[in-house]
Amino acid sequence: MHLSSWVGDYNVHRMLVDNGSSANILYYLAFQQMEINRAQLTPTNAPLVGFEGTRVFPLGAITLSVTVGDYPQQIIQDVTFLVVDCSFAYNSILGRPTLNSWKAATSTYHLMIKFPTEYGIGKLRGDQVAAR
């Protein structure tokens, strides 16, 4: 599922919601466009293993505030992303750890994520055109 949300001070488009991913990924090109100093990355040495079994070593990890949903039914949460320098059609991937912490229910059929908030059920709608 493809969506947009606020990450730090930036409205990040082309975010992939991946229930199968065990990590949150921010691709280096998006990281650079956010004008974050590379010195803010926390070193990490654990490789990521892709679908084909290929290994990718992250440049580091960074924790950024992510805002999803429409006020007042929104979540604002610090999310740790692994920054990876490789090409991909998306700017970032939101993985299972974040979705679980939001208690989110995803529906690929409806291109929607629902999550509980203090003020009722929040909703995120995916981009149908981009999903094709």
Model-derived features with residue positions:
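A short acidic-Thr-Gly-centered motif at the start of a beta-strand
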Residues: 1-11, 69
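Conserved catalytic motifs of the protein kinase core domain
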Residues: 11-12, 89
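Short hydrophobic beta-strand that contains or immediately precedes a catalytic carboxylate
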Residues: 15-17
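Aspartic protease core domain of the pepsin/retropepsin superfamily
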Residues: 19, 23-132
